[in-house]
């Protein structure tokens, strides 16, 4: 059985992403060394929009760069209009400051910036270091 290719839709007929309005929102920034993921939720925690460096077209080690985090944040902000935002930052990657800078440059009123990176209080024993 032969597979049929889906028809290509011309650019002028493609659906444009709809802009969603939120009164109070939470912007979650997860910045790891390998990627940066930005998620916008409402106060209840329902996801409104999200983007990541990988979803923006960056591959390999470029996903962990500050520029990739900047572009991912711009993609999310383009989809959402927020009247008041709380920013929760997790992780210690290069995209932390870049994403926060983009939010500030786009005139989104920031209510609070919180660092919620999990830190152990001497919990699990770390793995043994490799000897090469």
UniProtKB/Swiss-Prot annotation:
GO terms for cellular component: chloroplast; ribonucleoprotein complex; ribosome. Gene3D superfamilies: Ribosomal protein S11. SUPFAM superfamilies: Translational machinery components. InterPro entries: Ribosomal_uS11, Ribosomal_uS11_sf. It comes from the Eukaryota. GO terms for biological process: translation. Keywords: Chloroplast, Plastid, Ribonucleoprotein, Ribosomal protein, RNA-binding, rRNA-binding. GO terms for molecular function: rRNA binding; structural constituent of ribosome. It is found in: Plastid, Chloroplast. Pfam families: Ribosomal_S11 (PF00411). Belongs to the universal ribosomal protein uS11 family. Part of the 30S ribosomal subunit. NCBIfam families: PRK05309.1. This is Small ribosomal subunit protein uS11c. The gene is rps11.
């Amino acid at each position: 059985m032969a597979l049929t290719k889906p028809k290509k839709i011309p650019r002028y007929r493609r659906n444009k992403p709809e802009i969603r309005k939120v009164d109070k929102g939470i912007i979650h920034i997860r910045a790891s060394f390998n990627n940066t993921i930005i998620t916008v939720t409402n106060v209840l925690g329902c996801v409104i929009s999200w983007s990541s460096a990988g979803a923006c077209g960056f591959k390999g080690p470029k996903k962990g760069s500050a520029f990739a985090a900047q572009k991912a944040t711009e993609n999310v902000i383009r989809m959402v209009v927020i009247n008041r935002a709380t920013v929760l930052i997790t992780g210690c990657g290069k995209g932390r400051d870049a994403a926060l800078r983009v939010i500030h440059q786009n005139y989104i009123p920031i209510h609070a910036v919180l660092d919620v990176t999990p830190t152990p209080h001497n919990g699990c024993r770390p793995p043994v270091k490799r000897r090469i």
